[in-house]
């Protein structure tokens, strides 16, 4: 039986990130929507929840940590993956203790993110 | 699972509690036993390798060059063990050179110096007060050593996730508290922290190879790329860069080598 397609949301204020990740993640047959700010992403999440949210941390107005908190408050089963070019031990630990599924520093290869998503989807389907 | 690094003002106390933590968590215990192959490599006694972890270079002790090479080998061996996961590590100064890894729990255990002094006094003779003074002097020496070797003060509590004073809390209770930290979500391994440790491992392995010819070399790694900083004169830069690229390129896992002329060496 074919596995249910995952709905993945990618949020990053650098549009190149969404542009590059969308086709890379769609290769697995999943549905990917990209957003360049937290407001529009959260508005979309209010309409319907996503299985996986990939979000940058440093963004104007709404940062990745706030997105993490608001997404998990609305949908506890959603797996939130944090990406950042400013990774530190403190930020990584904060994100994890607030419920992030994983955390990866930029730059990364799309294959690295796909591996994390594969683990997340296994947990979602378990 | 997280990795636990124990640092203590007393090697014996640190070892004792580390073994208890390893037993409670069912983790592997890593200590100075891993130094034997390094001693063999340098044709030294294990005690001389341990000196690199305890003494600053001196006229009658280890030379700075040998001390630095030994420390680089100790780093390499230790980080290799930490990659194995489920580890309690003690006695190898890992808290001073494995930095920026979020699934590494660093704990400072302060021994009960009065109790330790009276214990040592009954074992070896001499007044407990005198031994306590000697122990305090030893801590000062350790601080000096850590600053000299790694530029970090190991007695500074801000370098740790937890500091436990055994004069206020007994060893079994301390063991329970430290082992309990391993279930905290914030200390679980993540892609970022695993990659940091892998990068550190690759950099350490490349540094050990390069140090034989370039004692002052600095190496950092990102994935399969390593960046080497070395003191080079302008006219020999190209030649030396070629040698470094050849040597480092032979290290398992290295695909690309960048060489920079160093501007600032501590």
Regions found by a protein language model. Give the residues of each.
Chain B
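Conserved phosphate-donor/acceptor-positioning beta-strand/loop module used by diverse small-molecule
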Residues: 100-123, 131, 135
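Short, non-transmembrane amphipathic alpha-helical segments
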Residues: 206, 235-259
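Short edge beta-strands and adjacent turn/loop segments
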Residues: 211-235
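ATP-dependent small-molecule kinase phosphotransfer cores
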Residues: 35-86, 126
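Glycine-rich phosphate-binding P-loop
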Residues: 4-21
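Short, structured interface segments
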Residues: 170-188
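Small-molecule kinase domains that catalyze NTP-dependent phosphoryl transfer to phosphate-bearing small molecules
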Residues: 129-171, 198-202, 207-208, 216
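N-proximal, solvent-exposed amphipathic alpha-helical segments enriched in charged/polar residues
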Residues: 188-217, 239, 243
């Amino acid at each position: 039986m074919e596995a249910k397609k995952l709905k993945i949301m990618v949020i990053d204020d650098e549009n190149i990130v969404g542009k590059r990740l969308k086709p890379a993640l769609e290769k697995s047959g999943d549905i990917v929507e990209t957003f360049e700010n937290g407001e529009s992403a959260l508005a979309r999440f209010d309409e319907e929840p996503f299985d996986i949210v990939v979000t940058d941390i440093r963004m104007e107005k709404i940062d990745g940590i706030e997105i993490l908190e608001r997404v998990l408050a609305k949908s506890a089963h959603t797996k939130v993956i944090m990406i950042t070019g400013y990774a530190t031990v403190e930020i990584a630990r904060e994100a994890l203790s607030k419920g992030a599924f994983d955390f990866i520093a930029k730059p990364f290869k799309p294959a690295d993110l796909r591996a994390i998503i594969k683990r997340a989807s296994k947990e979602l389907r378990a | 699972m997280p990795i636990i690094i124990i640092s203590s003002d007393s090697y014996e106390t640190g070892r004792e509690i580390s073994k208890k933590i390893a037993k409670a968590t069912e983790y592997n215990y890593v200590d100075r036993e891993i130094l034997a192959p390094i001693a063999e490599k340098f044709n030294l006694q294990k005690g001389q390798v341990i000196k690199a972890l305890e003494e600053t270079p001196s006229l009658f002790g280890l030379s700075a060059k040998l001390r630095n090479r030994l420390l680089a080998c100790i780093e390499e061996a230790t980080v290799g063990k930490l990659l194995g996961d489920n580890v309690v590590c003690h006695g190898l100064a890992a808290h001073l050179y494995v930095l920026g890894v979020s699934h590494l729990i660093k704990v400072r255990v302060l021994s009960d110096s009065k109790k330790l002094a009276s214990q040592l006094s009954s074992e070896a003779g001499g007044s407990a007060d005198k031994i306590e003074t000697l122990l305090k002097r030893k801590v000062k020496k350790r601080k000096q050593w850590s600053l000299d070797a790694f530029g970090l003060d190991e007695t500074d509590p801000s370098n740790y996730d937890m500091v436990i004073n055994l004069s206020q809390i007994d060893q079994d209770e301390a063991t329970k508290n430290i082992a309990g930290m391993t279930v905290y979500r914030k200390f679980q391994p993540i892609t970022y922290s695993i990659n940091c440790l892998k990068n550190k491992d690759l950099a350490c392995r490349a540094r050990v190879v390069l140090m034989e010819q370039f004692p002052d070399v600095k190496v950092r790694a990102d994935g399969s790329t390593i960046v080497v900083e070395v003191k080079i004169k302008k006219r020999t830069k190209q030649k030396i860069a070629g040698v470094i690229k050849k040597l480092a390129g032979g290290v398992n896992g290295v695909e690309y080598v960048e060489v920079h002329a160093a501007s600032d060496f501590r």
